[in-house]
Structure formats: structure tokens, C-alpha cells
């Protein structure tokens, strides 16, 4: 399985680590740490040297309770960073956005992947993504970032996320986005309680019936902190456990804050799966 974008190829026969680069003042874990161009490029360099093959640049926090930012502000935060990374590093670039204007400008700046927590539901986003021809990560979220964690409820969380993927794939194909351009993200922590999150993690491998890449992000999230009763800065161990469990089930892209540690964990996963004949655990 491979992804093609902007003349580049991403081989998905092994797990890739996607390093998180939040250029925001209010992200839940690292808000404000990298929201200048110099600091953002410096952190991107650290992640690339640590083994990240994808850098995910986001200019709007999607933490629970987060407020939206204007198009102009998000463009000002994201585009200079995307351009700088594209010019300096041999790495795939993902843009974490829901806005059509940012999608178009990010594609021009050198982005390879659109990572949209709202699955192209904002007006004009679907059309913008289709125009760029870039791969798109479709994420499941119940509600919106401002209210999603107030009282998430499902009759069957796996069935509902699965149904959502079916609907979104069909919607994208109708708009002219080829199925092979899509990635699927169950949306850990987005409108889900502890039980919902671990049910999805336990059954993650079942989503391979779509024959599409799986992107997962559990790094430093509440599903780790609540279980272990620790704050964001003390969630590395739990985050690594989640990453390994996901990769052993065949998740191709692991989105994380702690790149070096996750890259090393993925080497262990790869060695184990190789010894098993490259068959994932289900």
C-alpha cells in the first residue's frame, strides 16, 4: 500500500511516525511552545532527525473546548511554517486544517496530506480537497471540539464509526476524490469516553476491511491520562503502549508528540511483525 502526492511516494508497508507540530498558543499539550517560525522549524528539525517521516502542522487547536480561529490567522500561522519545512527537509508534510482556504494554500506551499478532524464537512472543504488532488485523512468526531466531550454516547461505537467511514468514503468519491487517496482515523478522544476509546483501540484492526491506511492519534490524550491518573507531560508510557497496540494491528501512521521514543517502539513492532511473516495481530 502506498500514498502518492506532490510527486512523492509514501510506502505504507511499515508504520510511519507523524510528528505533531502545533503552531498554536492553546493546544492541550504543547500550546505556545512552537508558535514562532524559528521555534517551529527548530522543532521540525528535531523530529525529522529523530525519525519522523511525516510532520503534521496545525494552526488551530482542536482540544476539548477549543474556540475556532479566523481564516487569516490560521493562514498566517501555518503557511510560513509549511514553506520553511518544504524548503529545508526531506519529509512528508501534513496540514491539520478544516478550512478550504488553508487547504488550497497549504497544497501550494508543499503539503502532501490533508488531515481534517471535520472530514471535509466545512463549506467548500470537500471541493478544495478534490481540487488539490492530495490524500485526505477522514476522522470521526461526535459533535465539535467545543462540546464533543460533554456527554459522548453511542449504542455501538465501533458500528457507528464504521458506518461513518462508509458514508464519508462515498461522499468523497462522489466529489471526485479517488478512494485510494483516503486515510481513516477513528478519532480517539474526539467525542468519546474512556470505554469508547479503548473499544476502538481493541478493534482497530477490523477497519482494515476498507483496504485504506489507518492514521491514529492517541499521544498524551485523556484516554491515557484518565486511565493512569497523570497529566499531559507524564503520559509518555501510556502513549507508547497505545502506539504499539495500534501498530501491531496494522495502523500505518502513528501521530505523536514524542517522536524518538515512538520511532524506537515502531522498530520493535516491525521486527516482531517481520518474525510473524509481516502479518498484523487482530
Regions found by a protein language model. Give the residues of each.
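Extended, charged alpha/beta regions that create polyanion-binding interfaces
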Residues: 1-2
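Short acidic capping loops at alpha-helix termini that bridge into adjacent secondary structure
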Residues: 178-181
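Active-site-adjacent loop and "lid" segments of alpha/beta metabolic enzymes
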Residues: 5-6, 12, 29-38, 42-43, ...
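Catalytic domains of carbohydrate-active enzymes, especially glycoside hydrolases
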Residues: 42-58
